[in-house]
């Protein structure tokens, strides 16, 4: 049976365009002109995913999102003109349960949607597979062991030649919250960190600024030539590749170039460069996300002597990228999200 998608948007043009795009991909599409109509339709038949605008009459999209997540969580993809450059609204949507964001221009919407059809279908299909309970488990602290219990021994890590120099992290769907959990747990003197998170162009700058306010380490959008230093995390800019080179230390390289593994930025680009440049001094981490970007790169890191970690299925919103890495034999450890940070700290000791 085809997944059921509910498109909630007050624009008839957008509803028609999205219905055609998703319908051609074999998805069953229902539409609603605003959230109140959507709630009535959801009472009759629960959708597998919702594509949601933000600015609508009678009830705005964020209020509707909060209600959906509180009452009967359904995977939501935000597709809105407000989800553009520097948008606090898009960050709010992701923090309150949306699994992904598609930015929509205010002019030429129909043409943009048609040009972006492949990404829209990919994101919405991934949303239908998202496990929102996994997101809750990932954000919940691990239970404390009972009094008197023997502490669990730290995992035995592969021998490392040289010092702990660089942590590289890749994520896609569900990754914004996973990255927050990971980076908030890092101490001020954590090893240098480079991050690729699949998200729209320019949106990454605001995402990095938000993380910087929450974390003890510095978090910023990477610029070409930035130094990768202890206590700093660099986030790949949207629509640009991030790699690393050695020039009197580790340096970020931000570049154009064709998509790799269907993505720009690509996790594979970052991981392959880290394997070449830092090898055994690297820890590679592949978090929740759709597709297989990063799986080959994580395997190359492991072959180069790096320690490698994949997020487990129980805490992944979409168990795509980590699953592919595990299938390739790329992961030394498979861990729930709350234990990934402790693995970083154990490795860095």
From Swiss-Prot:
Keywords: Chemotaxis, Cytoplasm, Hydrolase, Phosphoprotein. Its main location: cytoplasm. Phosphorylated by CheA. Phosphorylation of the N-terminal regulatory domain activates the methylesterase activity. The keyword Ubl conjugation does not apply. Residues 4-119 form the Response regulatory domain. It is found in: Cytoplasm. InterPro entries: CheB-like, CheB_C, CheY-like_superfamily, Sig_transdc_resp-reg_Me-estase, Sig_transdc_resp-reg_receiver. Residues 159-349 form the CheB-type methylesterase domain. Its EC number is 3.1.1.61, 3.5.1.44. It is an enzyme of class 3 (hydrolase). GO terms for cellular component: cytoplasm. Gene3D superfamilies: 3.40.50.2300, Methylesterase CheB, C-terminal domain. GO terms for biological process: chemotaxis. The modification 4-aspartylphosphate is found at residue 53. It catalyses: [protein]-L-glutamate 5-O-methyl ester + H2O = L-glutamyl-[protein] + methanol + H(+); L-glutaminyl-[protein] + H2O = L-glutamyl-[protein] + NH4(+). The active site is at 172, 198, 293. GO terms for molecular function: phosphorelay response regulator activity; protein-glutamate methylesterase activity; protein-glutamine glutaminase activity. Belongs to the CheB family. Contains a C-terminal catalytic domain, and an N-terminal region which modulates catalytic activity. Involved in chemotaxis. Part of a chemotaxis signal transduction system that modulates chemotaxis in response to various stimuli. Catalyzes the demethylation of specific methylglutamate residues introduced into the chemoreceptors (methyl-accepting chemotaxis proteins or MCP) by CheR. Also mediates the irreversible deamidation of specific glutamine residues to glutamic acid. This is Protein-glutamate methylesterase/protein-glutamine glutaminase 1. It comes from Anaeromyxobacter dehalogenans (strain 2CP-C).
